Amino acid sequence: MITAEYLNNFFLGYLPYVALTVLATGLIYRTIRRNNTIQASSSQFISNDKSLRWGSTLFHYAILLVLLGHILGLLTPEWLYNWFMTNETKRLLAILMGSISGAAALVGITLLVVRRFSNKRVWATSKIQDYVIVVLLLVQISLGLWCTYITTQSSLEDYMGMEYWAQGIFIFEPDSWKYIADADLIYKLHIVNGFLIFIIFPFTKLMHMIMVPVLYAIDHFRK
């Protein structure tokens, strides 16, 4: 019988390592192979399409802020940020920044999703994984905003549990999932969906977000 403990252990304990391994391996493989589709996909962003310009600009900048917020918010040791802010101040800052960047990312990804499904040229050149990831991103950002709202209503201990779980994953702490075993289901869906995005990300055109700047830097250094 599949128990809640088994599901928590699998999705919050093992899945992160599977997803991060696939992501890292995929990034390395695509970098070495230097797949032309990475650079070709970036040409879609040079366009007179207003929805594309606004959508891509909002999404790219906002999602970078979201990612930065997650990295700093979840992985910065408590003893370090306690030098200049309390845990409660950190939570309020996370709510504020998460709301702003999340809302901007939601508008941006919505414009891109509409364009991907309505533009015949984009439709013809897109693969199934490209559609899957934009839908997953739309779901992820929506869940993230929902999580932000829940954070305003939940206890500080619940918020800190996320931090302890994330840091436990990175230091290979056994049973780190127990920190968030009783967390709201929306948090867990947000986490699982995020790792699903990690798994398929290297195989989609969104690789240009990382690879185009990296390949440009490599080529510039060689010259």
What do these predicted ranges mean?
Residues M1-L23:
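Hydrophobic transmembrane alpha-helical segments in integral membrane proteins
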